[in-house]
């Protein structure tokens, strides 16, 4: 039986946007689920902040990683929760928001109002708006605000602009670049060639569960990158050495 992901090995560096590019169904989802802890992996090692987190819980991985998931409804938000509840999903146990087993509602409200203003999250009833009633673009803004504000060294962003309008896409792109410029490592998974070429500092192409090429976006054309993504070309890890 073939593994969904096979011998994938790379480093994500501080201060860069590393993009994993590929056509849907070539192992990207399985890889990200193994990295973030949504699914267990059959083997291999994941090292983050100098620690082996290969068998760590999602919560422990979250100590060094923020995750903007591919499916914002399934993995990003609890749709029947309010906006403010969603904004503290990973942080409600922190002393800032909890004391003696009780949530500090005023602190949660103040935090939510700050993020709403800073990230221009638009919702009919402000912090108490049900997430389900918000537009896709504002749902995504909420997820990005929550994950970025956690201030972790690695940001994993999977299809962060899927289903968004042009204005929302531009906002997402600006935020990812801002985080890169602030010294974060940004791991971007995208199917969109234009997005890959415009945002990436380094590109890894995944095809049938393997990395088939590593490229500098300044040294490859959109057309050639498309050939690698479709499996028509293959390179060794070093740029330009075709196999």
Which sequence ranges carry the predicted segments?
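Glycine-rich phosphate-binding loops of nucleotide-dependent enzymes
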Residues: 1-243
